[in-house]
Amino acid sequence: MDNSTGTGEGCHVDSRVDHLFPPSLYIFVIGVGLPTNCLALWAAYRQVRQHNELGVYLMNLSIADLLYICTLPLWVDYFLHHDNWIHGPGSCKLFGFIFYSNIYISIAFLCCISVDRYLAVAHPLRFARLRRVKTAVAVSSVVWATELGANSAPLFHDELFRDRYNHTFCFEKFPMERWVAWMNLYRVFVGFLFPWALMLLCYRGILRAVQSSVSTERQEKVKIKRLALSLIAIVLVCFAPYHALLLSRSAVYLGRPWDCGFEERVFSAYHSSLAFTSLNCVADPILYCLVNEGARSDVAKALHNLLRFLASNKPQEMANASLTLETPLTSKRSTTGKSSGAVWAVPPTAQGDQVPLKVLLPPAQ
């Protein structure tokens, strides 16, 4: 992220080269991400009501994505006006703060999901207390407080910068300021690389636990591996290009603060990579809702109930429609012994954490 203050000559960046791709991508994310995240939020809420700690992380992830999507219309307008912010300094600070904070909030909650799944698979009994709803709520509160606090510095600085062509940049300055460069390094290493490395370790632990389980069928192992790998892939594909350019820009500035050549060359690529991070808002609900056949069935039922409600205009039908979401993300067992989706079953044992993993599939309808 860049922050700006006042006016000045700055670097010669061509704002006309990126007025099509970022707004087009943002419009796509609004159209797809808004309904899918609303559906994911509803599904996560129902998991929380079933005392599933994973639903807490998914619910917070959906809330963060929805807040981010609410800022996109103004950024579409910003890019269509060739990087010219016309909505005043207050809105620039607020919407820029939400926009950029979401990157690290999303990464943090994806990391929380990876750690939760690792504990559920590799140590289902030893760390059972860490996988409670109360613990998930406490962890989520820490995530929000930490990430919002770490990204709050721009709220105390001017964020509008007018260049020589009378463009008013919001949350951007070319070249950046020195304190911003150091802050960017913190974001790259602490906000991006550290949680991604932790997710890699969790994935490795999940692979070991699954491979050592002789009772787990091959197809079930593939599903578990696919889920863990999908979490890593979302962070890598959506956020790695942006942070690679952010790191490069910050390092070049700290080495040669007077040199605008690099800024001018990567300007378009940097904006494109920033827009690419918005795909996270589409990938998150797809990861949750479409990770396996059982989840796809639940989504289909929810959409069927919604369409029936809209067609009949009878709210009572929607209220009576039930949706049970027990996907392979879930490690909880139903108190009734029944589930409409697939779960990771962990039978009780007195011999440590070496327990067989088994995916229980719902009976054929």
Swiss-Prot record:
<keyword id="KW-0297">G-protein coupled receptor</keyword>
<feature type="topological domain" description="Extracellular">
    <location>
        <begin position="1"/>
        <end position="10"/>
    </location>
</feature>
<comment type="function">
    <text>Proton-sensing G-protein coupled receptor activated by extracellular pH, which is required to monitor pH changes and generate adaptive reactions. Activated by an optimal pH of 6.8-7.2. Ligand binding causes a conformation change that triggers signaling via guanine nucleotide-binding proteins (G proteins) and modulates the activity of downstream effectors, such as adenylate cyclase. GPR4 is mainly coupled to G(s) G proteins and mediates activation of adenylate cyclase activity. May also couple with G(q) and G(12)/G(13) G proteins.</text>
</comment>
<dbReference type="GO" id="GO:0050729">
    <property type="term" value="P:positive regulation of inflammatory response"/>
</dbReference>
<dbReference type="GO" id="GO:0016525">
    <property type="term" value="P:negative regulation of angiogenesis"/>
</dbReference>
<keyword id="KW-1015">Disulfide bond</keyword>
<feature type="transmembrane region" description="Helical; Name=1">
    <location>
        <begin position="11"/>
        <end position="47"/>
    </location>
</feature>
<comment type="similarity">
    <text>Belongs to the G-protein coupled receptor 1 family.</text>
</comment>
<feature type="topological domain" description="Cytoplasmic">
    <location>
        <begin position="48"/>
        <end position="51"/>
    </location>
</feature>
<feature type="site" description="Proton sensing">
    <location>
        <position position="157"/>
    </location>
</feature>
<feature type="transmembrane region" description="Helical; Name=2">
    <location>
        <begin position="52"/>
        <end position="82"/>
    </location>
</feature>
<feature type="disulfide bond">
    <location>
        <begin position="92"/>
        <end position="170"/>
    </location>
</feature>
<feature type="topological domain" description="Extracellular">
    <location>
        <begin position="83"/>
        <end position="87"/>
    </location>
</feature>
<dbReference type="GO" id="GO:0007186">
    <property type="term" value="P:G protein-coupled receptor signaling pathway"/>
</dbReference>
<feature type="glycosylation site" description="N-linked (GlcNAc...) asparagine">
    <location>
        <position position="3"/>
    </location>
</feature>
<dbReference type="InterPro" id="IPR000276">
    <property type="entry name" value="GPCR_Rhodpsn"/>
</dbReference>
<dbReference type="Pfam" id="PF00001">
    <property type="entry name" value="7tm_1"/>
</dbReference>
<feature type="site" description="Proton sensing">
    <location>
        <position position="271"/>
    </location>
</feature>
<feature type="transmembrane region" description="Helical; Name=6">
    <location>
        <begin position="217"/>
        <end position="252"/>
    </location>
</feature>
<keyword id="KW-1133">Transmembrane helix</keyword>
<keyword id="KW-1003">Cell membrane</keyword>
<feature type="transmembrane region" description="Helical; Name=4">
    <location>
        <begin position="132"/>
        <end position="158"/>
    </location>
</feature>
<feature type="transmembrane region" description="Helical; Name=5">
    <location>
        <begin position="175"/>
        <end position="212"/>
    </location>
</feature>
<dbReference type="GO" id="GO:0007189">
    <property type="term" value="P:adenylate cyclase-activating G protein-coupled receptor signaling pathway"/>
</dbReference>
<feature type="topological domain" description="Cytoplasmic">
    <location>
        <begin position="124"/>
        <end position="131"/>
    </location>
</feature>
<keyword id="KW-0325">Glycoprotein</keyword>
<keyword id="KW-0807">Transducer</keyword>
<feature type="transmembrane region" description="Helical; Name=7">
    <location>
        <begin position="263"/>
        <end position="291"/>
    </location>
</feature>
<dbReference type="InterPro" id="IPR002276">
    <property type="entry name" value="GPR4_orph"/>
</dbReference>
<dbReference type="GO" id="GO:0010447">
    <property type="term" value="P:response to acidic pH"/>
</dbReference>
<feature type="disulfide bond">
    <location>
        <begin position="11"/>
        <end position="260"/>
    </location>
</feature>
<dbReference type="GO" id="GO:0060055">
    <property type="term" value="P:angiogenesis involved in wound healing"/>
</dbReference>
<dbReference type="GO" id="GO:0007200">
    <property type="term" value="P:phospholipase C-activating G protein-coupled receptor signaling pathway"/>
</dbReference>
<feature type="transmembrane region" description="Helical; Name=3">
    <location>
        <begin position="88"/>
        <end position="123"/>
    </location>
</feature>
<feature type="site" description="Proton sensing">
    <location>
        <position position="167"/>
    </location>
</feature>
<dbReference type="GO" id="GO:0043114">
    <property type="term" value="P:regulation of vascular permeability"/>
</dbReference>
<feature type="topological domain" description="Cytoplasmic">
    <location>
        <begin position="292"/>
        <end position="365"/>
    </location>
</feature>
<feature type="site" description="Required for activation">
    <location>
        <position position="147"/>
    </location>
</feature>
<feature type="topological domain" description="Cytoplasmic">
    <location>
        <begin position="213"/>
        <end position="216"/>
    </location>
</feature>
<dbReference type="GO" id="GO:0072144">
    <property type="term" value="P:glomerular mesangial cell development"/>
</dbReference>
<dbReference type="GO" id="GO:0005886">
    <property type="term" value="C:plasma membrane"/>
</dbReference>
<keyword id="KW-0472">Membrane</keyword>
